[in-house]
């Protein structure tokens, strides 16, 4: 599901105070843990971010990820994964929007959503031109690019994986590019000055498929069905759909404030 619905699952209330009577009943010899001092180096908060390249809500949410990285820098680490909401785009939209105007109805829906957010541009004929057959083709190609980073074929500090994800989204939503087509994918890679032969090698070897399969396993294990979805705190907290930046920020600040081994209060 490419969802704009805002949903919180399994998270603690921000700023919740522990009652004094409960504190008084704690055993005298029980240790109370405090946040580490500034001199101590904390491991970054790992955020698993699931999205579909063709999802308008993930397109909208990119600015929030950028702001998180600017605000928290090395205090967070975002792991990008893909959920195939539009794995069979044609049939999905034709079936789900049959009684709501078909592809034209979905196009109107996406444009109405986009008008509410000034930081994005959506082509007026979105989902009406050369419609991508499957987002999975995009995700496979993007994993091939990610492998270039992992193997050091491209400089990891250049963040080409993140840049490529955005380039695919921008090409689709602003230019109606059929990003599921391999020729279009290579054209985008060339614009990013990426080594085409090396990307093809990751696909030909099966390694990119293996990375995509790992995403499928994670989607199943973590029951991810919405794009975008953020999962952190070792799977205990998740934010689904169109979640505002301040909500995401508050959750991260809580995790940074509390030591990793702090026990939950009942």
Task: Kindly give the residue locations of the regions a language model identified.
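Intrinsic-disorder-associated, low-complexity terminal segments enriched in Asp/Asn/His/Tyr and depleted
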Residues: 6-7, 21, 38
């Amino acid at each position: 599901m490419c969802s704009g619905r805002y949903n919180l699952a399994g998270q603690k209330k921000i700023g919740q105070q522990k009652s004094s009577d409960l504190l008084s009943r704690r055993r005298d010899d029980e240790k109370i843990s405090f946040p580490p001092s500034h001199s101590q180096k904390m491991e970054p908060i790992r955020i698993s971010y699931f999205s579909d390249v063709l999802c308008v809500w993930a397109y909208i949410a990119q600015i929030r990820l950028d702001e998180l990285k600017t605000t928290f820098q090395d205090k967070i680490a975002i792991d990008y994964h893909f959920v195939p909401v539009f794995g069979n785009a044609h049939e999905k939209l034709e079936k789900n929007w049959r009684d709501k105007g078909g592809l034209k109805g979905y196009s109107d829906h996406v444009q109405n959503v986009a008008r509410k957010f000034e930081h994005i541009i959506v082509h007026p004929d979105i989902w009406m031109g050369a419609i991508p057959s499957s987002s999975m083709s995009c995700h496979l190609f993007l994993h091939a690019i990610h492998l270039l980073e992992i193997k050091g074929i491209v400089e990891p500090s250049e963040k080409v994986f993140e840049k490529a994800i955005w380039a695919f989204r921008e090409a689709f939503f602003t230019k109606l590019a059929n990003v599921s087509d391999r020729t279009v994918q290579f054209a985008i890679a060339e614009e990013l000055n990426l080594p085409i032969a090396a990307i093809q090698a990751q696909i030909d070897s099966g390694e990119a498929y293996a990375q995509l399969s790992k995403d499928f396993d994670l989607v199943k294990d973590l029951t991810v069905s919405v794009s975008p979805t953020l999962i952190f705190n070792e799977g205990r907290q998740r934010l689904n759909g169109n979640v505002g930046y301040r909500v995401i920020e508050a959750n991260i600040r809580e995790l940074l404030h509390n030591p990793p081994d702090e026990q939950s209060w009942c």
